[in-house]
Swiss-Prot record:
Transmembrane segments: none
GO molecular function: dihydroorotate dehydrogenase (fumarate) activity
SUPFAM superfamilies (alphabetical): FMN-linked oxidoreductases
The keyword Cytoplasm belongs to this UniProt entry's keyword annotation: yes
The encoding gene: URA1
The protein, known as: Dihydroorotate dehydrogenase (fumarate)
Regulation acting on activity, per entry: The activity is independent of the presence of oxygen.
Other known facts: S.kluyveri has two isoforms of DHODase, a cytoplasmic isoform and a mitochondrial isoform.
A Pfam family it matches: DHO_dh
């Protein structure tokens, strides 16, 4: 019997756990439609701000041997552009590939304003609040401020009654895992997304003796294979600390079916792909699906739930 990649996430069955990471191949309606028509199990919009943003000056993205460095600065077409797409997509009944909606306001007030609009709209999908963008000059990552994170999410859940997840930055200390999990466990949160890129890395071109991206004097978020061990650690740390009702999306370093298997083994339910989607395009979902199935067949697993979260310790 061939392996099934079907998973249940927030009371909906998805054909497979793969989706794009917000920020990659989801800026325009054309790119969103390409995701919709791909083998992805779900897809998510670009993280939106209230108004359209051009983002940081170019060059702001650079492919490097084991991944990428970027300092995009949240370029997007604006909240209303993506909400219109989401509502039309929903109205047309094309929900075989579920759509998530991502917001990343430049301030607490902006996030609350956008989430209130989603709450008041007919959108009935899942919303992701990005509290972890590392590439907006002068704007610290909210989720590294634990008290502010608690304050924001407490305010959000006073009025937001639809499914909501949060995208987190990577944490590197057990005390930080404990503190953040303690905050999130008090809230009616649907999921956490671990992780956003590792902020403020630096990559150097030895030939020119210079940095490779322009913003922030070359400092940028690191993605791809470089970040997989950190991503797996965050997925596992939150899986073992959060209430079982709070699901986990694993993001970071997914290039092969084996990478996907490792994220699932650590406890992720769904998986987002960023750097490798940028490099390969939407056909990556066909390959990842095939490779994950082949690995599961080889191990004798017929469903993801047979091994998800069951990482062995020594």
């Amino acid at each position: 019997m061939s392996a099934s990649l079907a998973i249940n996430f927030l009371n909906h069955t998805y054909e497979n756990p793969f989706m794009n990471a917000s920020g990659v191949h989801c800026m325009s309606t054309k790119e969103l439609d390409e995701l919709k028509d791909s083998r992805a199990g779900a897809f998510i919009t670009k993280s939106s701000t209230t108004s359209k943003r051009e983002g940081n000056p170019e060059p702001r993205y650079f492919s490097v041997p084991l991944g990428s460095i970027n300092s995009m600065g949240l370029p997007n077409e604006g909240f209303d552009y993506y909400l219109k797409y989401a509502l039309e997509y929903q109205k047309n009944g094309s929900t075989s590939t579920p759509l998530f909606f991502s917001v990343a306001g430049m301030s607490v007030e902006e996030n609350l304003k956008m989430l209130q609009k989603i709450q008041d709209s007919d959108f009935n999908g899942i919303t992701e609040l990005n509290l972890s963008c590392p590439n907006v000059p002068g704007k610290p990552q909210v989720a590294y401020d634990f008290e502010l994170t608690k304050e924001i999410l407490t305010k959000v859940f006073e009025f937001f009654k639809k499914p909501l997840g949060v995208k987190l930055p990577p944490y590197f200390d057990f005390a930080h895992f404990d503190i953040m999990a303690g905050i999130l466990n008090q809230l009616p949160l649907s999921y956490v997304n671990c992780i956003n890129s590792i902020g403020n890395g630096l990559y150097i071109n030895v030939e020119t003796e210079s940095v490779v991206v322009k913003p922030k004097n070359g400092f940028g978020g690191i993605g791809g294979e470089y970040v997989k061990p950190t991503a797996l650690a965050n997925v596992r740390a939150f899986y073992t600390r959060l209430n079982p009702t709070i699901k986990i999306i694993g993001t970071g370093g997914i290039k092969t079916g084996q990478d996907a298997f490792e994220h699932l083994l650590c406890g992720a339910t769904m998986l987002q792909v960023g750097t490798e989607l940028y490099k390969e395009g939407v056909s990556i979902f066909d390959r990842l699906e095939r490779e994950l199935k082949e690995l599961m067949d080889k191990k004798g697993y017929t469903s993801i739930e047979q091994f998800r979260g069951k990482l062995n310790s020594l």
